[in-house]
Amino acid sequence: MLKETSVVIIVKNGAAHIEELLNSVIDFNEVVIYDNGSTDDTEALARNFSNVSWYSGNFLGFGPTKAHAVSLAKNDWILSLDADEIVSEALKNSLLASRMENRQAGLILRENHFLGRAIRYSGWGKDPLIRFFNRTSAQFNDAKVHEQVVPQQGVSIVQLSGVIKHYAVDDLSQFLEKVNRYSSIRAESGLKARHPILIILKTFFAFFRTYILKLGLLDGWRGLVISVSNANGVFWKYIKAYAKKKVKNS
């Protein structure tokens, strides 16, 4: 199965982890990298790997961009990764041994790392994602953020062994930029404007849900940062949508 699979990656300025990522998928015969305007050494580093096919194009939102990148692959079986994700040895072996059928899709656990440590709680514990699929029976949806692979009706889901190691956050400045960027994408993608009082309530609940209900407090100071950042993201996406509506109507 491994040799019949194309690894598909979208990237922008992914030099920090691209070599580790590509070494983790070096046994795959094709790695499609779809770049969205990198200005660092991502391309130079990636071209050192003989199985890499390099493409460049505009970022259309995560769902549409990943769907386009998938269309560039030679194989129908797809392993979709982000540029800050690493395939574990156990997962690679699981894919190597896999004899999945076209009407099946692979569910993979993602282990999220925040400033050098795996997060167990805060809603960031090992999250199951469909990342291995046949493009004839499953596709990415059109969501601009928080995109998902959507299997066609009747496709069965198979749990694969191993994990994807996700370097979610390497430094706090990067994290804040990501929160800001995601909130802008959500605000521009038809998010309904809310009254400021409701925005405040949603912001407080986002913190409470992450820190208390999802046990972020057990992740120590990292859990606190994640909880505050989640609340911050909720506040900014709604206030940006609200401001956009007010300016438009003024």
What are these regions (language model features)?
Residues E43-L72:
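Conserved donor nucleotide-binding strand/loop of the catalytic core
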Residues E4-S6:
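Cell-envelope/extracellular polymer assembly enzymes that use nucleotide-activated donors
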Residues P64-V70, W77, L81, S88-K248:
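Catalytic-site signature of metal-activated, phosphate-bearing donor transferases
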Residues K12, G37, L60:
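Catalytic phosphate/metal-binding cores of nucleic-acid and nucleotide-processing enzymes, i.e., regions
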Residues A15-A16, S24, D35-A44, D82:
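A conserved acidic beta->alpha catalytic loop
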Residues V8-D27:
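Short, well-formed alpha-helical segments that are part of the catalytic scaffolds
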